[in-house]
Structures are given as C-alpha cells and as structure tokens.
Regions:
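A surface-exposed beta-strand-loop module
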Residues: 25, 70, 77-79, 89, ...
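Hydrophobic helix-coil surface modules that form long, contiguous segments used
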Residues: 230, 235-244, 250-449, 478
C-alpha cells in the first residue's frame, strides 16, 4: 500500500521522466545541415525540353523573330523615327492570342517604374546622420532633363500584314499587342510598328545607348556620336520555363531575347560612318572606292588598316553635310541589333582567320573619334582578335562575320551581337597632344576583352541575363581573366580568391541566383563571386583538363539556345 508521500514521489518521478523524454524527442531534429546532400531535391525535374544530363531535350523549342527595319536619324534634333516589319514564328506547343514587346526607352520617362521606385541617396555612408542630405548638380540636372525632354517610345501605329490596326496596351517598358486571330503552334504572323523617340543625352543620364555631344568641334553646333541600342520595339522572349519573360526594365537587369534574322537600313547624314550588327550590304553606295579597297586589303593584313584615316575623320568633323545616305546591314541568327553613327569616326580593321571554321574570316574593326587617339589605334582591334582566339579555344569558333569595338564616352562597356560600346579615352594635354596612362591602357584592354567576350555569353549561349545574371557575367568574367592573363600576366584580373574574401566576409549578402534588380552589390555578386568560384573549380577541384572539357561541352550544347541553371 502506497502512502500519500510515496504516491506523490512516484507521480513526480513519472512526470519528470515524461518531461525528459519529451525534451529528448524535441531535440532529435537539431540544427544539422548536410552539406553533401544529394541535389535531387533542389534540381528541377527533367522533361522533353531540358533533359537530366543538362542538355537540350529531344523536343526543345524556342521562338524565332525576324526584323526588317527602316530608320531615319535626325541629327539636328537628336531624334530617331523608324518602321519595323516583324515576322514572329511560334515554335512553342502553345496557342498565343497576344504578343509582348519591350519598349526599353520608356525606362527614361520621368514617370517610369525605374524612376518612381528609385530611392534618394544624397549622403555618403560615413556622413553624420544629423547632416542634411545633399544632391549633386549632376543628379539635379538628370532629374530636370527627364522632366523636360519628353523621352520614351512614341508608338504611332501597330498593324498586321493586311494593314488591320491591332489593339495594343503600353505598360511601362512593355507593350501587349492583341492578335486578331490566335497564333497556333507552327504558324507565324507578320506585324508592322511605326515608332519614334527622342534619343537620350548620354552625358546627362549615362544610359547604355544615346548621344554624345562635342560642342567644341569646329563644325557649327559641334558634332555627335550616336550609339543606338534598345532602340526598337523588340519581342519579349517566350520560354518553356517561364512563358512570357515580361519583367519591367528597371535599368540594372539586362535582356532576354529571341534569335532571328535582321535587315536594317539607316538613313543618316552623308558624311557619317556607321558601325552596326551584321555585314554592310551596300558599300558601293556609302564608301569611296579607296575605302572599299582598304577594306579588302584589311582582310589579309598583318596589322590593322585604316578604312577611314584620322585626317579624313578630321575633315569630316569640320565640314558637315546637308545630304543623307542610307546604310544597309544584314545579320543572320542574332538576338539583337545595335548601331553607332558619327562623322567623327576613325575606322580601322583587320581580318581574323579561323581556318576550317564555317566563318573563316572575321573582320575585327574599331570605330573611334580623335579623342580615342593612339590608345585605340594601338590596342582596340588587336585586343578584339586576341579575345576571339582565346574564347574560341575554350568554347566554339566565332560564327559571325564581324566583331566591332566602338568608342562611346558615356558607356563604360556594353555588348550586342557583333558590336560593343567601350568608354576609355586619351587625355588632352596643354600642348594639344593626347596621351594615356598605364591605368587607361589596362582599362581599355580589360573592357574590350570583357565586352567582346559577351559575344559568346550571352549573345550566342543565350542565358536569361535579367533572371540569372551570373550565368553570363560570372562565366564571362572568369573567361575574360584567362584571356587577360594571356595578354598580360602583370595585369590584376581579379578572379583569384583573395580578391573576393572581403565581400565574402561582408554582411547582407544575397545568393548568386538573386534576380539582377534585387542584388545589393551587383559587381561582387554577379561578376566576381561566380568567376572566383569557377576559377577555384578549374584550378583546385577538377583540374584544367576535366573542367575545360566540361565547359566546352556546355558551350557547344547551348550555342544559339537558352540554358537555365539546371
């Protein structure tokens, strides 16, 4: 028989044991994370479009969009007007009732989402919190310019091939065009869009494309360099993994586009020289006999040949012309089209030979004003060729007929198919000469390698830049460091682990998978961190032989296709 005291002790012991047992069960999960767990739980399920081996599936598809564009450049008013005829081929298994277009020039409107969602950063991080915020004169000028300049695409008409008007709705930097009939799998549709816009002043807003004014030139009113990019309404990509990739263009995130063929004509002042995606179709209409002979000579020359000499460019600068000329370009299987136009351009070229390749001769070319000087004539075209040699060795033969580097002062560096805009220039000295420092030389070499490298990633290996920035910037930063070290091993190319440790120790990092408009520090996160990781993978974990085989196989499999991270 239990006494009351013994019964109390027994009940206490049972309760205590139960409590201990409950605590033990709660603790079994712990905080352990298996760093070597299988990836099956995070990788997407393989399908007929993207197989489990990481290659395009047996039913892989992508859309095709062909453009025929006629554009007119109004230099005096810095305005562009154009008509584009678009053929959209629906290779998807889906029926489409509307199409989405990108109107990237609308990003510069004062009421754009980019401007309305931007935050004011008027003080340095080290400023006293009690100090009033400051706005720079440049920021104030930019705000006033956007308010006054009437920027953005003006869409004048949208119609089909039978000239039926099509309903269209503009939403920020996007436009939805409603089709009169559903576009079924395997069918195509033709549309026409008439548009115009005021070209952005690059010195004020530092955009990816716009105009640069040289008011000190002898010509009355000065001269201009026009760099035209994101200039025409472009089809939004329609993909197997996301459908319409219609994210708003906020500025940081770049572009997701479809491949197609382009025929583009640009009517410009008669003394302008035009550089563009593709190949010039009418040299007899726009170049002198001597310039055409030089261009032919350059194909097999041992060093770059002037197509337009510095003296000829200087004569163009001084005079100006009231006449116009139309340059016609064609490009096959490209995902975009950009061009540059100016009477200031010096033009040099040299043929790059690829024996046995489908494109055996590639014309490497540079276009630059006198402000580029000997820095550009000494290095730009040769660096273009060096980059093609190195990247082709690690991936595939360069498939296009031209590779161009254009000096645009307000663009640090930007790439499009077959053409890049690069910023470094010489410094004007008191005696009128132009010189450049070692740092400026290295900057030009580095930026040309990086931007020409983008011809491969993502202009050919067509990853989604806005969604997964690291897939083009990280891979390209890794490979540009390889090309850079082969050019000059003394230049610090920045992919060794020691260059990323400070960032890796910093606070508020986000995953490299973060969408580009949401990254806190785009440079370290999308460029340096993945480039360093790839470098470690090649040099330490896999070894060069195994890594180089895998990298080349990835490049080959996804050339002219759209890879995703998995």
């Amino acid at each position: 028989m239990l006494t009351a005291r013994r019964l109390s002790l027994l009940l206490f012991a049972l309760l205590w044991a139960g409590a201990l047992q409950g605590q033990g069960i709660q603790q079994t999960k712990g905080s352990f994370q298996d760093k070597f767990r299988q990836l099956d739980e995070v990788l997407p399920t393989a399908n007929v479009y993207r197989n489990a081996a990481g290659a395009p599936g047996h039913e892989y598809w992508q859309q095709e969009v062909d453009y025929n564009i006629e554009a007119v450049l109004d230099e005096d008013n810095q305005r562009l007007s154009a008509t584009e005829i678009i053929r959209y081929q629906n290779n998807s298994p889906d029926t489409l009732t509307y199409l989405w277009f990108q109107l990237d020039q609308n990003r510069f409107r004062s009421d754009s989402m980019a401007e309305m969602s931007g935050t004011f950063n008027g003080s340095s991080p080290d400023a006293d919190s009690n100090d009033p915020a400051r706005i720079s004169l440049g920021q104030l000028r930019a705000l006033q310019y956007q308010s006054d300049a009437n920027l953005g695409h003006q869409i004048n008409a949208v119609s089909d091939s039978r000239e039926n008007a099509l309903a269209h709705t503009v939403v920020g930097t996007l436009m939805r065009v409603d089709l009169l009939e559903p576009l079924r799998p395997g069918d195509d549709v033709e549309l026409r869009i008439d548009f115009e816009y005021n070209i952005v002043n690059g010195d004020v807003l530092s955009p990816r494309g716009g105009y640069e004014h040289f008011p000190e030139d002898e010509r009355d009113g000065g001269n201009y360099i026009f760099a035209l990019s994101q200039w025409f309404p472009r089809l939004v990509a329609y993909t197997d993994y996301e459908g319409w990739t219609n994210k708003e263009f906020l500025g940081s995130g770049e572009f997701t586009l479809e491949f197609g063929d382009y025929e583009v004509s640009m009517t410009v002042p008669a003394d302008h020289i035009v550089s563009a995606t593709g190949e010039l179709q009418n040299p007899g209409d726009v170049l002198t006999r001597e310039q055409r002979d030089r261009l032919e000579e350059a194909q097999s020359a041992a060093r770059p040949v002037y197509i337009v000499t510095p003296d000829e460019a200087l004569d163009n600068e001084r005079e100006g012309s009231a006449q116009t000329a139309t340059w016609r370009f064609a490009a096959e299987n490209v995902r975009d089209f950009a061009w540059a136009s100016s009477r200031k351009f010096i033009w040099d070229a040299k043929g790059h030979q690829q024996p046995g390749a489908d494109q055996e001769t590639v014309m490497a070319m540079s276009f630059y004003p006198k402000e580029g000087g000997t820095l550009w004539s000494d290095y730009s075209t040769e660096v273009v060729i060096h980059t093609l040699e190195v990247y082709s060795r690690f991936s595939f033969d360069y498939p296009y007929p031209t590779a161009q580097s254009v000096n645009v002062g307000f663009v640090g560096g930007m790439e499009y198919p077959m053409i890049t805009f690069n910023g470094p220039r010489t410094e004007l000295q008191e005696d009128g000469s132009r010189t450049y420092s070692l740092a400026e030389k290295r900057f030009l070499i580095g930026v040309v390698i990086h931007e020409i490298g983008h011809f491969y990633f993502p202009m050919i290996v067509n990853s989604d830049e806005r969604q997964w920035t690291w897939m083009d910037e990280g891979l390209n930063s890794y490979l540009d460091s390889v090309a850079g070290r082969e050019w000059d091993a003394e230049i610090p190319w920045g992919v060794e682990p020691r260059y990323i440790t400070d960032y890796m120790e910093s606070q508020n990092q986000v995953p490299v998978m973060t969408q580009s408009d949401s990254v806190l520090r785009l440079g370290p996160n999308a460029y340096s961190k993945p480039a360093t990781a790839i470098n470690i993978l090649r040099e330490t974990i896999m070894g060069r032989e195994l890594f180089d085989f895998a990298f080349k196989e990835y490049s080959r499999l996804w050339a002219f296709k759209r890879p995703t991270p998995a």
